[in-house]
Design a protein with these regions (language model features):
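Mid-domain, small-residue-enriched loop/turn segments at the edges of structured enzyme/sensor domains
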Residues: 167-170, 202-238
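Active-site SXXK
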Residues: 75, 102, 129-155, 185, ...
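A penicillin-recognizing enzyme superfamily signal
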Residues: 65, 69-84, 96, 107, ...
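Beta-lactamase-like hydrolase cores
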Residues: 53-57, 68-99, 183-186, 199-200
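Non-catalytic, structured segments within soluble enzyme domains
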Residues: 1-66, 211, 216, 224-225
Length: 333
């Protein structure tokens, strides 16, 4: 306590006395940039904490995440500084998952977002079509897993009309290439062979295969979904991770441990589930290597000396206002 005389003396001191000089707005420059780099990731971590029953602002938690800051910085710089986007209005959503354990090591929800904090995270939004990135997941993966198709299985790229309709399925070049192998159809991303494959596999088995990879929806899938489903970049990344690790699906996660105020530590490390045979994972991965070479659909993404296996995807605008443009472009691998 203090005496009355000390209290009276303290009241006479200006509140400005002893204050540090003004150093400027620390939200500018380096601090603001650092916050933007991890913005999308932190937003999802906060959401996960709330889902687990915590108040991240008042509970005094120590949270360890799976973020790889170096990878996150590279991702941020690539999207905001390195890649030559045609316009600052063009957006992106990226998720990077460790195939060995499901850890989300980097994530980007957008680019050139200005002063927006915790804005739309496109990496977890599920309202955009995946395009052809779904073909290994819904068409060819199930064909290998359930029908034991070899990579040289013959498939037909010929005129196809969706059953019960007069809707003719076309490819980007409005051409048909006749009989080809499953490998060629996947590498060249031909639509008709993919839908014919799904028709043979059946919606039920395709749905089962997708569910094993963490992907589902309330409505029943249809044949049209064989060339596109509504899914997030994070879901696609986690599903493709199963191809890379030999067929095991890990539910992606951000938080590795939480320590509460009373010193109790909870650790998180989801166990993987077998989603497909090792043979299926190997065959799909082997075919996806060809996407970056020869007649593959991603030859412009080829990197010398880098082990690559992946799949492109694209979606058209819903109207004819952009007849030669693509609304979304995907890359998964």
């Amino acid at each position: 306590y203090i005496s009355q005389s000390q209290a009276n003396a303290a009241k006479q001191v200006s509140i400005k006395e002893g204050l540090d000089p003004n150093h400027g707005n620390t939200s500018d420059n380096s601090v603001q940039v650092k916050e933007k780099v991890v913005d999308s990731y932190v937003k999802e971590v906060l959401s996960q904490l709330v889902a687990k029953g915590y108040n991240p602002y008042t509970d005094g938690l120590k949270v360890h995440t799976n973020l790889d800051l170096s990878a996150q910085k590279h991702l941020y710089n690539a999207a905001n500084n390195s890649v030559a986007f045609q316009s600052d209005k063009m957006q992106t959503g990226v998720a990077v998952v460790d195939p060995n354990n499901g850890q989300i090591v980097a994530m980007l929800g957008g680019r050139k977002t200005g002063n927006v904090v915790y804005g739309l995270n496109r990496a977890v939004q599920t309202d955009r079509s995946s395009g052809s990135t779904v073909k290994p997941l819904m068409d060819y993966g199930p064909a290998i897993q359930y029908l034991q198709w070899p990579t040289y299985k013959s498939v037909e790229d010929t005129k196809f009309v969706y059953p019960g309709t007069n809707k003719v399925l076309h490819d980007f070049d409005n051409q048909y290439k006749g009989t080809m192998t499953m490998r060629e159809a996947l590498v060249q991303s031909r639509n008709v062979p993919a839908i014919r494959t799904l028709q043979t596999v059946g919606i039920s088995r395709a749905t089962k295969f997708l569910k094993g990879l963490g992907i589902s929806q309330s409505k029943a899938y249809t044949l049209q979904n064989g060339i596109g489903i509504y899914v997030s970049p994070l879901q696609i990344a986690a599903a493709y991770a199963a191809f890379a690790n030999g067929g095991t699906y890990y539910k992606p996660y951000y938080i590795s441990s939480i320590t509460t105020q009373d010193g109790k530590t909870l650790t998180y490390s989801p166990s993987g589930k077998r989603a497909m045979s090792k043979a299926t994972a190997y065959m799909i991965t082997d075919m996806l290597k060809g996407v970056f070479t020869g007649q593959g659909s991603a030859t412009k993404a080829y990197l010398s000396g880098v082990y690559q296996a992946g799949k492109t995807g694209s979606t058209d605008y819903p109207t004819s206002s952009h007849p030669d443009g693509e609304m979304d472009s995907w890359m998964a691998g």
